[in-house]
Regions:
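Conserved small/polar residues in nucleotide/adenosyl-binding loops
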Residues: 204-206
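Acidic/histidine-rich catalytic neighborhood of metal-dependent amide-processing enzymes
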Residues: 128-202
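Acidic/His- and Gly-rich active-site-bordering loop/insert found
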Residues: 2-123, 142-151
Length: 206
């Protein structure tokens, strides 16, 4: 199987509506970390969504309690294929800012995915549920094409980024070996131009 086959599978994931179906399901979960105490059940639901999704892709999964008792759980997934392979750690966050329903247009609801004027609306579509849904789709397309990734994959999805990532630094220190990798891909950050993807090749103090 070739790179072209993998790209064809990835494009089909978007064109056949499966991407929107997956994203719709995730957007509907109200993971507002700024009011975490009232959203604990939603955070658990999102962790369950990640567990199911990644186990279907052959990952071992685990949900960790946050070292900060006032912050949400942390999801970790791992797919180890070969000790000689490089390991890629991918970061994302499942939490969103508050819905702020009163600030949305009358025909839009933050927890309901809607395509309008060729744009996708819903809380988390741009930050960050959309991004890690894209990443999941890419991993799936590779696995469907050749049955393996060709690298070892680790996934970290926190639920407190919109509140300053409480507990994440402590978690990283405690789980240094678990998170050890050769490459970090963090699909979260600013975009310099709306119509053009922005790629940062190196960052310090991560």
């Amino acid at each position: 199987m070739t790179r072209e086959h993998a790209l064809k599978n990835a494009i089909a994931y978007f064109d056949d509506g499966h991407f929107l179906d997956d994203l719709k399901r995730r957007v509907a979960i109200k993971t507002e970390s700024q009011i975490y105490e009232s959203r604990k059940a939603d955070m658990t639901e999102y962790m369950d969504e990640m567990i199911k999704t990644f186990q279907e892709l052959g990952y071992e999964t685990e949900v960790f309690e946050n070292p900060n008792s006032k912050a949400g759980p942390i999801f970790f997934g791992s797919r180890h294929e070969n000790s000689n392979n490089k390991t890629v750690l991918t970061y994302g966050h499942g939490d969103v800012i508050r819905g702020q329903e009163e600030r949305w247009e009358p025909d839009l609801v933050p927890w309901e995915l809607k395509v309008k004027n060729n744009k996708i609306y819903g809380r988390g579509t741009a930050d960050n549920k959309g991004q890690h849904t894209v990443n999941i789709g890419a991993l799936k397309s590779i696995l469907e094409t050749r049955g393996c990734l060709g690298f070892n994959s680790k996934i970290l999805i926190e639920t407190g980024e919109e509140s300053g990532s409480p507990g994440l630094a402590d978690f990283a220190r405690q789980q240094k070996e678990l998170l050890a990798s050769d490459v970090l891909i963090s699909s979260d950050g600013p975009r310099l131009q709306p119509e053009r993807p922005t790629l940062f090749l190196s960052l310090i103090h991560i």
